[in-house]
Amino acid sequence: MKTNLISLAFAALLLFPINASADPDPNFHIYLCFGQSNMESGGRMNEADRTVDKRFLVMADFDAPNRGWEKGKWYHAVPPIAAKGRGICMVDYFGRTLVAKLPENVRVGVIKVSVPGCKIELFEKDSFQTYIDGERDWMKNIVKGYGGNPYQFLVDMAKVAQKDGVIKGILLHQGESNAGDKEWPNKVKGVYDNLINDLNLKPDEVPLLAGELVHADQQGRCAGFNTIMAELPKTLPNSHVISSAGCTTNDRLHFNSEGSREFGKRYGVKMLEILGFKPGESK
């Protein structure tokens, strides 16, 4: 009987939102995540994926009555970590990697906005409309779900999150649709600068982590773009490129479950290094 009560109490944690505090909690670390299809989903979940430390949270991007989610509130980050999502993505294992190493009093929260197939231009604050007007109808429908403006959707969610905690970093996975675009680093810098300004952040305190596309060692269809991505830190000083070498794929374009788990861990390890933790260092 006691075991059943404990199980019910734990289940309640998954269904009900985490209460926001009156003032932002400096030990609640928030990460903004955006991009295209690999940021959306990386493959099927297994039972182990559903075991998540209660200190890892996700802000509901949409209302999801079937999950008990209300947009703009925090929930235990059991995948899929998007109301309309499926499977897991790199963000799942990014968060898990952080909470496994950070002190017990630190929580990690993520906000995720992803539009499969989009160019980085979709997140350009002043010119996104021109871009989306020329895109395919299915993508326009996804964008409509974000109020017609995914960038502003991310900013609005982030402002809500800032009432609860502190934004510590930005995660990006995008580039397949910009393959060959040598201006991509400059475009990413523009999006980053706008986020920093619109959220009143300090650029030297908020790094951007950008992950490579499926690597050449996996015969990635867009692997050549990684040479362009490698230039990003020269354009955006507080940015870091995460290697995708060895991260597996089933179609040479999207990371599969195993690849997404490994890739997310690498994002997490890099962020821990930025926060001052050495590889293998315990809490």
Regions found by a protein language model. Name each.
Residues M1-L5:
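Positively charged n-region of N-terminal signal peptides that target proteins for export
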Residues S7-P17:
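Bacterial N-terminal signal peptides
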Residues I18-A22:
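Sec/Tat signal peptide C-region and signal peptidase I cleavage site
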Residues D23-K283:
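Cell-envelope and extracellular/periplasmic
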